[in-house]
Amino acid sequence: MRLIPLNQAAQVGKWAAAHIVKRINDFKPTAERPFVLGLPTGGTPLATYKALIELHKAGEVSFKNVVTFNMDEYIGIPADHPESYRTFMYTNFFNHIDIQEENINLLDGNAENNEVECKRYEDKIKSYGKINLFMGGVGNDGHIAFNEPASSLSSRTRIKTLTEDTRIANSRFFDGDINQVPKYALTIGVGTLLDSEEIMVLVTGHNKALALEAAVEGSVNHLWTVSALQLHPKSVIVCDEPATQELKVKTVKYFSELEAENIKDL
């Protein structure tokens, strides 16, 4: 596991965007051999999406031969609802880049049969072989995608009941009213995520400090699903200084020295 300890959340977005652009450009994707990118929603990746849009407009990267898969979607709210994850992705990213519509893959939270929809999504991912890079965020309780505490670490795309903590955290997007936050969601599984060639998780803010501690210094534990990153051969966590508050000083120092060349220009 790599840990990229930076000072500010804006630097996390800048570093993550540069890493994605390098991976895409080094891959040299074509229509027949696209780069497959997994994407999250939420507040944390917004700085990364903004930086990616700027790099695209500067001619540094094209998304024409990039295929995307999103992590999750609420069940039961209209696709055009302002807080659906479909709306989030188009508003904050897809509408500003040259990605082809047919290359965008999103879970359908209004499917007639949710189990069939989850299988369709898994099969679509498998049709590309694997996801080359999956970017994610993490919840205060260590959940990744909507894999809440006690989720199976070998789970696949499925329906999940959202915890009260998650619904309270997400109520800020629903006028502060938890009753407006859906109780269920479709989400990729931890096993689905671990199948990716590379996983990059963004962690910002002091409220994520316990989750970061569990991911880096704790044992692999289904109560902190982000800890499953320890099982992956190519995982990277990009964090800001407030998120490191629960880590040992020597842990932060170790990774700061290890990644010095990769963070010196930020």
From Swiss-Prot:
Give the CC-aspect GO terms.
cytoplasm
Question: Does this entry carry the keyword Transferase?
Answer: no
Q: Where is this site: Part of the allosteric site?
A: 151, 158, 160-161, 254
A Pfam family this protein belongs to?
A: Glucosamine_iso
Catalytic residues of the enzyme: 72, 141, 143, 148
- Report keywords, A-Z: Allosteric enzyme, Carbohydrate metabolism, Hydrolase
- Which SUPFAM superfamilies would you find in this protein's record? NagB/RpiA/CoA transferase-like
Record's superkingdom?
A: Bacteria
Instruction: State which pathway it belongs to.
Output: Amino-sugar metabolism; N-acetylneuraminate degradation; D-fructose 6-phosphate from N-acetylneuraminate: step 5/5
Activity regulation, short description: Allosterically activated by N-acetylglucosamine 6-phosphate (GlcNAc6P).
- What are the recorded Gene Ontology BP terms? carbohydrate metabolic process; glucosamine catabolic process; N-acetylglucosamine catabolic process; N-acetylneuraminate catabolic process
Gene Ontology MF terms: glucosamine-6-phosphate deaminase activity; identical protein binding
**Enzyme Commission numbers on file:** 3.5.99.6
Reaction equation(s) it catalyzes: alpha-D-glucosamine 6-phosphate + H2O = beta-D-fructose 6-phosphate + NH4(+)
Role, per record: Catalyzes the reversible isomerization-deamination of glucosamine 6-phosphate (GlcN6P) to form fructose 6-phosphate (Fru6P) and ammonium ion.
Query: What quaternary structure, including any partners, is listed in this protein's UniProt entry?
Result: Homohexamer.
Entry's family note: Belongs to the glucosamine/galactosamine-6-phosphate isomerase family. NagB subfamily.
In Swiss-Prot or TrEMBL terms, this protein is called Glucosamine-6-phosphate deaminase
Q: Which organism is it from?
A: Vibrio atlanticus (strain LGP32)
Instruction: Name the lineage.
Output: Bacteria, Pseudomonadati, Pseudomonadota, Gammaproteobacteria, Vibrionales
